[in-house]
């Protein structure tokens, strides 16, 4: 046994030495743990990537009394036929076993049919489509399969937060270009007001540029890139022989007056583009974690190599159910009841409600043209953040304060920025509106009570 001496200090008392007895095995264990921690520290490829906005803010929203407009998941019900197809699949014995590693045959066939119509070209279900563990898995496959250490990858700011760490884990260098808002002169502020400078974008291309990551409709802004903007990007990709990884998970969620254009359909782009889609966003089933990549066989085969040596395959009954759900809506694509048509109509009403609500309490929302998020400038609320961590950006402090004191949560927009750009976005927070009316009612109550306290 080992003896150690400590001093006990208490208010109003003189300190006295006390003896603590430690077992030698405990001391040895502590020393061994310290050595092990030093020896088996993190791999360099994940250095500095341990902070994650979803881990941090999902914990805050776990309190059932908090109205959660933060993380982007629906609390509305998915279509009944989607759930019914999953139930059917679960009762078919061979649907509970492994399926084809690159995508369940019925699902890749359905995706080939759907996107063949959209692209107006034949898409080989086995060679030009890869089903992965969500859009995250599709992004990971794309970056690991196509990007080398030392390559540069262009990312527009703000960006979905996993882009930068995935690029860094591949040993590549992210090169950032900001989307900037045009002056609005007090008029309605929309995601269309945010764009890039074509000359500035061209200046980011170099001999080291391997790829550009595009996100349309955009998260968090809700921007739907115009054909003209996409043509600028496409021309630069062709000129500099650059890949395009196009994250289009919100492709069906586009609102009145706007059209989603796939950059892969522009001249010279099919052969250099990986387009990523999501079952979670298409059918409001984010917990299914199914995504897909579509592109030419000479690119998809490298993504397949990553997948076969990592995720290997995705859940068979989920893929089988998704295939059947797609066939139901493929057959009625011109029908208002088709979920690809009915969901954006439903969400546009919710979006407009959120815009009115945010305006009514003195906030300045950026009206999204697509997706299911709305950003608002919260600086006018004048919240007292003195009890928050002073080292954090304003939006982090604000959301934590709002969650604690108002029982309403959102996501800080600076989480979607590189370190240099964070100060330009830290007065903005992102709200999710793919929620039941009762959830939005509760949020409205909180905002109205808050506003009445100010006046």
Swiss-Prot record:
Temperature notes for this entry: Optimum temperature is 60 degrees Celsius.
GO cellular component: mitochondrion
Residues carrying N6-acetyllysine: 117
Signal peptide segment: none
Reaction equations catalysed: L-kynurenine + 2-oxoglutarate = kynurenate + L-glutamate + H2O; L-kynurenine + glyoxylate = kynurenate + glycine + H2O; 3-hydroxy-L-kynurenine + glyoxylate = xanthurenate + glycine + H2O; an S-substituted L-cysteine + H2O = a thiol + pyruvate + NH4(+)
Pathway membership, UniProt: Amino-acid degradation; L-kynurenine degradation; kynurenate from L-kynurenine: step 1/2
Organism domain of life: Eukaryota
GO molecular function: cysteine-S-conjugate beta-lyase activity; kynurenine-glyoxylate transaminase activity; kynurenine-oxoglutarate transaminase activity; protein homodimerization activity; pyridoxal phosphate binding
Tissues in which the protein is found: Widely expressed, with higher expression levels in liver, kidney, heart and neuroendocrine tissues.
Entry's EC annotation: 2.6.1.7, 4.4.1.13, 2.6.1.63
Modified residues annotated as N6-succinyllysine in this record: 117
GO biological process: 2-oxoglutarate metabolic process; amino acid metabolic process; biosynthetic process; kynurenine metabolic process; L-kynurenine catabolic process
Activity regulation text: Kynurenine transamination is competitively inhibited by cysteine, glutamine, histidine, methionine, leucine, or phenylalanine.
Gene3D superfamilies per UniProt: Aspartate Aminotransferase, domain 1 (3.90.1150.10), Type I PLP-dependent aspartate aminotransferase-like (Major domain) (3.40.640.10)
Binding residues annotated for substrate, in chain numbering: 72, 219, 430
Required cofactor(s): pyridoxal 5'-phosphate
A Pfam family this chain is assigned to: Aminotran_1_2
Residues modified as N6-(pyridoxal phosphate)lysine: 281
pH-dependence of activity, as noted: Optimum pH is 9.
Keyword list, A-Z: Acetylation, Aminotransferase, Lyase, Pyridoxal phosphate, Transferase
Keyword Transferase listed: yes
Described purpose of this protein according to its UniProt entry: Catalyzes the irreversible transamination of the L-tryptophan metabolite L-kynurenine to form kynurenic acid (KA), an intermediate in the tryptophan catabolic pathway which is also a broad spectrum antagonist of the three ionotropic excitatory amino acid receptors among others. May catalyze the beta-elimination of S-conjugates and Se-conjugates of L-(seleno)cysteine, resulting in the cleavage of the C-S or C-Se bond.
Database matches in PANTHER family: FI04487P, KYNURENINE--OXOGLUTARATE TRANSAMINASE 3
Family: Belongs to the class-I pyridoxal-phosphate-dependent aminotransferase family.
Protein known as: Kynurenine--oxoglutarate transaminase 3
Organism encoding this protein: Mus musculus
